[in-house]
Amino acid sequence: MEWNGLKMIISTMEPQVSNGPTSNTSNGPSSNNRNCPSPMQTGATTDDSKTNLIVNYLPQNMTQEEFRSLFGSIGEIESCKLVRDKITGQSLGYGFVNYIDPKDAEKAINTLNGLRLQTKTIKVSYARPSSASIRDANLYVSGLPKTMTQKELEQLFSQYGRIITSRILVDQVTGVSRGVGFIRFDKRIEAEEAIKGLNGQKPSGATEPITVKFANNPSQKSSQALLSQLYQSPNRRYPGPLHHQAQRFRLDNLLNMAYGVKRLMSGPVPPSACPPRFSPITIDGMTSLVGMNIPGHTGTGWCIFVYNLSPDSDESVLWQLFGPFGAVNNVKVIRDFNTNKCKGFGFVTMTNYDEAAMAIASLNGYRLGDRVLQVSFKTNKAHKS
């Protein structure tokens, strides 16, 4: 079957409890906490509801081009949008994809829902049409204990209704909670009940009462300004341009979850495949590579050659394999002109050298189905197609 290898990978993935909502949000949460539409409820019948998808829990450093490339591998897209904060320009971690063919939308859900990208497990579901009952259901919570986890925050608020998403703001340098969070309910009336029940109350472990109010209240403009300062503060962990900093954060996250990558594999991975420290070339030293003839290096990133793919393999399989290691620019499976079947190899272009090298170290020799993959940086030698 065409999707056997892909389904095998999805079935071995473990959901991210820390990034996900409570278990009753089966229709898909939204990872944004301001002005974010909720996922569509089951049973919608409009034509748009069959082609329009909402994608949650995207890596914050994923670009519009990477977003389009991922979902474009499924079928023809009419439109797609990665939603960004209007003040900071930062991705809010969710987006929308509208396919031309409803079958492609359904295929995208079946294929990409649960896909592990970097440190995130994305959620793909039908987008729910907006209505008065679901608007303005997002709450701003301050005064939270610094030790409170996202799961504990959800447990505190879940008694008032179905939680779509939750978030606790943390210091970008120390990782310590700022005592501020967001909760988005399925309906506004649930949010109103939570305000009545929790505003001014002391949750377990708190020394002061918490403040609970609607996040989109005009008085919350100051909190948006604070968020803007978080991203623009000169006290950043890494000096230099912001896009370089983002790539270093990607590497930090990658190293932190390196051993967790093994859960995606169908077979054991030796410890040497996921070393605790792996940085042959840092992003800060990339400028020294200009003009050098380095295997795999292209104008858009680092090209990886993947050999011994099965005839039924397609681009989605490559996304599944390489997505957990870092930012993937594009993937390509080389197909036979007559049969349209995979000729046994393909290419993956990744933005960052460290992440590409980690992917090669982990996936070279990996058994996918009944085949052992050969993975390496692409050399200048052209592969016949």
UniProtKB/Swiss-Prot annotation:
Instruction: Indicate where this protein resides in the cell.
Output: Cytoplasm; Perikaryon; Cell projection, Dendrite; Cell projection, Axon
User: Which GO biological process entries does UniProt record here?
Assistant: 3'-UTR-mediated mRNA stabilization; cerebral cortex neuron differentiation; dendrite morphogenesis; learning; locomotory behavior; mRNA processing; positive regulation of 3'-UTR-mediated mRNA stabilization; RNA processing
Post-translational modification, as annotated: Methylated by CARM1, which leads to reduced RNA-binding activity and enhanced interaction with SMN. Methylation at Arg-248 by CARM1 weakens protective binding to the 3'UTR of CDKN1A mRNA and down-regulates CDKN1A protein expression, thereby maintaining cells in a proliferative state. Methylation is inhibited by NGF, which facilitates neurite outgrowth.
As for what it does, the entry says: RNA-binding protein that is involved in the post-transcriptional regulation of mRNAs. Plays a role in the regulation of mRNA stability, alternative splicing and translation. Binds to AU-rich element (ARE) sequences in the 3' untranslated region (UTR) of target mRNAs, including GAP43, VEGF, FOS, CDKN1A and ACHE mRNA. Many of the target mRNAs are coding for RNA-binding proteins, transcription factors and proteins involved in RNA processing and/or neuronal development and function.
Q: Where does the record place the modification Phosphoserine? A: 38, 233
Q: Which residues carry this modification: Asymmetric dimethylarginine?
A: 248
Task: Describe the subunit structure.
Answer: Component of a TAU mRNP complex, at least composed of IGF2BP1, ELAVL4 and G3BP. Associates with the EIF4F cap-binding complex, composed of EIF4G, EIF4A, EIF4E and PABP. Within the EIF4F cap-binding complex, interacts with EIF4A. Interacts with SMN (via Tudor domain) in an RNA-independent manner; the interaction is required for localization of ELAVL4 to RNA granules. Interacts with MAP1 light chain LC1 (via C-terminus); the interaction contributes to the association of ELAVL4 with microtubules. Interacts with MAP1 light chain LC2.
Q: What CDD domains would the database entry show?
A: RRM2_Hu, RRM3_HuD
The UniProt entry's GO CC annotations, sorted and at most eight, read:
axon; cytoplasm; dendrite; growth cone; perikaryon; ribonucleoprotein complex
**Disulfide bonds, which pairs?**
none
The GO molecular function terms of this record are: mRNA 3'-UTR AU-rich region binding; mRNA 3'-UTR binding; poly(A) binding; pre-mRNA intronic pyrimidine-rich binding
Q: Where is the composition biased (Polar residues)?
A: 34-48
Where in this chain does the record put each RRM domain? 51-129, 137-217, 302-380
The domain-related comment in the record is: The RRM 3 domain is required for binding to poly(A) RNA, for the association with polysomes and with the EIF4F cap-binding complex and for the stimulation of translation. The RRM 1 and RRM 2 domains may contribute to polysome association and stimulation of translation.
Keyword annotations: Cell projection, Cytoplasm, Methylation, mRNA processing, mRNA splicing, Phosphoprotein, Repeat, RNA-binding
Q: Where is the sequence biased in composition, kind Low complexity?
A: 18-33
Name of this protein = ELAV-like protein 4
Tissue expression, per UniProt? Expressed in pancreatic beta cells (at protein level). Expressed in the brain.
Positions bearing Omega-N-methylarginine: 248
